[in-house]
């Protein structure tokens, strides 16, 4: 989908921006004209993402803003709150678009999964999304600003998957969190939606055995795995006023998998 500069006045915070879907989202939002605050646990990876971004709204060659990289472990409350403070200090305003894309997997069968692996996936994928959503919403409400919060869940959060009890639970929780936030924050002019990617070609899915990839691909009606840019297209739509009457939605980007 071609960019349309729908976000020329927006400041977008993207967590998990150092690679994969988060990086593609950062690139797409910048192409739409947004200033991007790219955050990752790996600060160097976030800086690499920023180097890929053009000047916000610079179709005529005149820079109208800047992008910046941030490092944070969003699973920690003080770090998540400090991230929002640092973004506001850098850009002199809170982000009007917030995309929580930070996520991890630690796969194991239910019978053998350690409590540590359960806790860590829940901490990053669900608690981290809660902490960023809360801090961003608090900043927006305090400033009186409108906003769009977009949380990256997964189709696995809807249907489950063998060996991923922790991941599926965390992503199901993101859907519930987002729907509840939509109910609570709508009166403040803040829209909240979740995006449910299917099997997308990312560093995370590259770890899958080829036999598993082939089996999954055969189940997808469109016949192929998605690209990170497919998810970024949907996020750009949800970030823009083109989706101004959409909140509480869970948008699947799965090629029809599990429909």
From Swiss-Prot:
Residues found modified as N6-succinyllysine: 158, 171
Pathway annotation from the record: Lipid metabolism; fatty acid biosynthesis; Steroid biosynthesis; estrogen biosynthesis; Lipid metabolism; mitochondrial fatty acid beta-oxidation
Organism: Mus musculus
Keyword set, alphabetical order: Acetylation, Fatty acid biosynthesis, Fatty acid metabolism, Lipid biosynthesis, Lipid metabolism, Mitochondrion, NAD, Oxidoreductase, Phosphoprotein, Steroid biosynthesis
Any one annotated GO CC term: plasma membrane
Binding site for substrate: 154
Phosphoserine modifications at: 58
Name of this chain's protein: (3R)-3-hydroxyacyl-CoA dehydrogenase
EC number: 1.1.1.n12, 1.1.1.62, 1.1.1.239
Top-level taxon in the UniProt lineage: Eukaryota
A Gene Ontology molecular function term of the record: NADH binding
Self-association and partners: Heterotetramer with CBR4; contains two molecules of HSD17B8 and CBR4.
Binding site for NAD(+): 13-21, 40-41, 72-74, 167-171, 200-202
Residues modified as N6-acetyllysine: 66
Lineage of the organism: Eukaryota, Metazoa, Chordata, Craniata, Vertebrata
Annotated catalytic residues: 167 (proton acceptor)
Catalytic activity: a (3R)-3-hydroxyacyl-CoA + NAD(+) = a 3-oxoacyl-CoA + NADH + H(+); 17beta-estradiol + NAD(+) = estrone + NADH + H(+); testosterone + NAD(+) = androst-4-ene-3,17-dione + NADH + H(+); 17beta-hydroxy-5alpha-androstan-3-one + NAD(+) = 5alpha-androstan-3,17-dione + NADH + H(+)
InterPro entries according to UniProt: NAD(P)-bd_dom_sf, Sc_DH/Rdtase_CS, SDR_fam
Top-level class of the enzyme under EC nomenclature: oxidoreductase
GO biological processes: androgen metabolic process; estrogen biosynthetic process; estrogen metabolic process; fatty acid biosynthetic process; protein heterotetramerization
Localization terms from the record: Mitochondrion matrix
Similarity section: Belongs to the short-chain dehydrogenases/reductases (SDR) family.
Known role: Required for the solubility and assembly of the heterotetramer 3-ketoacyl-[acyl carrier protein] (ACP) reductase functional complex (KAR or KAR1) that forms part of the mitochondrial fatty acid synthase (mtFAS). Alpha-subunit of the KAR complex, acts as scaffold protein, required for the stability of carbonyl reductase type-4 (CBR4, beta-subunit of the KAR complex) and for its 3-ketoacyl-ACP reductase activity, thereby participating in mitochondrial fatty acid biosynthesis.
Tissues with expression: Kidney, liver, testis, ovary and spleen. Oviduct, uterus, mammary gland, vagina, prostate, clitoral gland and moderately heart, dorsal skin, brain and lung.
